[in-house]
Amino acid sequence: MKTEITVIDNGVEVTREVPIRMLLVDFIRDVVGLTGTHQGCTFEGVCGACTLHLNGEAIKSCMMLAVQADGQEITTIEGVATNGELHIVQKAFQEHHGLQCGYCTSGMIMNAVEFLRVNPNPNEKEIRHALIGNICRCTGYQNIVKAISAAAAELNDSVS
């Protein structure tokens, strides 16, 4: 059985007919064609690679049906940059080597963007706690923590 849904995806209205049991991550990747959102844990919600923003909040898209997003606003990693300019968090990950293989990176960045919106001046312990829902098998997290800390400092400088 299929149904029609409409979402605002990275600022663009998208209407598609989808199977009622299609996961949001599959809708984003296979129907919309935005492959920056990854699937890592076979739909258990533990790795965070599928993290995107739904109405401004970080969610794991492998834990939600596409039909549940009908009428909602979605932002994926492809929508974080503005006018071709990387987001401060994206730049910080690049500058502080916060990635190796890159598989977890989009989820880490999406989580970090929302985390810094809620907590703009975090300490290292708070950053590490915020990363609990995102798994990285390559980096050991140290450079990811440095990147998020640097992004927070830059965001705070830009507000001053």
Where do the language-model regions lie?
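Signature of N-terminal electron-transfer/Fe-S-associated modules in redox systems
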Residues: M1-S160
